[in-house]
Amino acid sequence: MLSRKCGSLSLTLKNFNSTLSVAYSASDAALKIPIADPSENAASKYANKPAKTLNDAVRERSERFRSRVYTAKIPKLHEEQVSSGFSSPCNKLRSFLHSRDYMAFLVELTLQSRMDENFGAKMFQNNDLSIAEFSAFIEGLLSVNNLLHKLSATLPNVSGTEMVFSLYQLYLKTVTPGPLSPLQLHDFNKFIRFFIRSAQLRKAQTVLDCILKSNNNQLPCDSATATHYLQLRCGALPRNWKVLDENLGRSTRLGARKNRYQLVSHSYKALDHKSVLTFMSLLSDPKSVWFHRKSAALESAVVYSLGFMGQLKLLEEHVWRNWGISLQEHNQVTDASFTSPSSEVLVAVLTSYASNKNISSALHLIDGFMAKYPTLELDHVFWRRLFQWSTRVWSEKTDPRGELSRGCWRVMREWHAARNRQLPADAVLLNERFVVLSRTNNYRDAIEVVEQCYSSFFQKANLSRHEAVLFQKFAKLILKNMAHLGYYHKPLKFIKEWSPNKLLEHTLRAYFEKHRNAYSARKQRRTEAAQKAQKRFDDEEEDSMLLGRLW
C-alpha cells in the first residue's frame, strides 16, 4: 500500500473494457417516467440560414465521386442508365449510399427536400428508397468522425445540427404508431448520441420524448435508451458539470478543454431526481429483467447521476451492493459472486467523488477494486482521468511537493509493471503530469517520465507537433535544473540520448548553453563578491592588528 500525507491531505493508494437490447419491448420491464419539460434543459440553438450553396455543393461532390461510381463493377443491364448520368434523385441517393459517401447523400437529400417539401414522403411511399437503406445511411452518417466540422467545411452557410435534425424529422415519417422496432430504437439512439455530443440537448430531449411517447410514456427495457435517459434527465453527463478548478480558482465545465467539436451545454441540470433510485434497485436485483440488460455505460450513468446530485452515501451503498467494495474496511465483501466492473465504471466513481471534493474516498474505493479484482482491466481513459483529476483538485498550499500526482504515477507504474506492460504514451496524461512537475520544479521525476514513456513516442515515424512540444517542455525543465546545479556532461548525455532528431537536439543544446552560461555568470559574480568580502575582512583584520600594536 502506498500512502502519502501532506498538510490536511491524506491519501491511500494501492496496486491498483453499450449494448442494444433487441427484446426491448418487455412490458413487465418498462419503467414509468415522470413527465418533464425538456425545454428547461436547452442548449444553444443554431439559426436555420438559407442554403444557397447546397446546389453547388451537390454538383461538386457529384463530379468528384462520379468517376468512382461509373467505374464500379455493375451488371451490363444497368450500364446504359449509369453511363447517361443519374436518372433520378433517388438513384443519386442510392449511388451515394453504395459508395458510402454519406455527406453527399445528406446534401442531396436536403436539397431535394427544400425544393419539394413532400420529397421524403414520396420517396418512401414509392419505395424509391427502402427503410433499411435509409437506416444504413443514418448509421453511416452519424458514425462519421467530426461530422459537424466536415459539414461546416462542405457547407459553411448551413447549420450541421439543423440538417441532422431535419433528417430526424424526415425519419419520423417512416414511424407508425405504437412501440418502435429494434432498428428504429437503435437509430433514434444514434440521433440522441449525436445531439448530446453536439451539445444540442433540447434536440436530444425531443428524440427521447418521441421514444417515450411511442411506449406510453414508459422507458423501454433497452440499455442505450436508459443510458440516454439518465444522461439527459438525471445528470449523467459529466462533460457538462461545473466543477471548481483549484488551479484556476474558479468553476469550469469538465468538457471545456476538449476539442472544439465536443461541445458542452451551459444550461445543464437534472430534471428527474427519482428514476435513478429505481435504476439502483433494478440493476442490483438478479431477479429483475434490467439486471440482465445492464451494460458498462448504463452502470456508469447511474454512478454519474448519483455524483451529480451529490448523493455520495447512496453512491457508496450502490458500490457496495454491486461490487462488494466499501469505504469501511470491515464492510468489505469477499463473496466471489460479484462481477468485475469495467474501467468505465471506475472512471465514473472517480469523477463522482472528485467533483464533490472527496478524491481521497475515490482513491480508497479504487484501491479496494484493485485488491478485490486482480484481473481488472484499466484502459488509458482511466489513467488519463486519474491524472486530470489529480491536477484539477491539487493545491500548492496543501500539497506543495505534488505528492498526489506522484502517488498516482507510482500506482500506474506498478500496475503496468505487475502485468509486464509498458506505460501508456498518452500525451494528455503526460501533460497533466507536467503541470505538477513544472510548478514544483521536480526535474528528477521529469527524468523518470522521459525514460519510461518517451521511448514509445520515438518509435513512431513522426512525432506530432503536440507531442514534440510536450517533450520539449519536459526536456527544458530537466536541462534548466541541471544547468543551475552546475552539471555539464550529464545534460549533454541526456540531449544526445533523447533528442528524436537533429533539429530538436540543436534546440535543446542551445537552451542548455543559455542556462549554463547564466549559471557560470552567476557563479562568477558570487566568486567575485566573496573575494571582495574576503578582501574587506582581511583589510579590517590588518587595521585591527596595527591599532593593537599602537596600544
UniProtKB/Swiss-Prot annotation:
Coiled-coil segments on the chain, per record: none
Region listing for Disordered, in residue ranges: 530-551
Keyword Ion transport attributed: no
GO molecular function: RNA binding
Record key words, sorted: Mitochondrion, RNA-binding, Transit peptide, Translation regulation
Main localization of the protein described in the UniProt heading: mitochondrion
Localization terms from the record: Mitochondrion
GO cellular component, one term: mitochondrion
Protein's UniProt keywords contain Mitochondrion: yes
GO biological process: regulation of translation
InterPro entries: ATPase_expression_mit
UniProt record similarity statement: Belongs to the AEP2 family.
Summary of subunit composition and partner proteins: Binds to the 5'UTR of the OLI1 mRNA.
Function: Required for translation of the mitochondrial OLI1 transcript coding for the mitochondrial ATP synthase subunit 9.
Name of the protein: ATPase expression protein 2, mitochondrial
Native species: Lachancea thermotolerans (strain ATCC 56472 / CBS 6340 / NRRL Y-8284)
Gene that this sequence comes from: AEP2
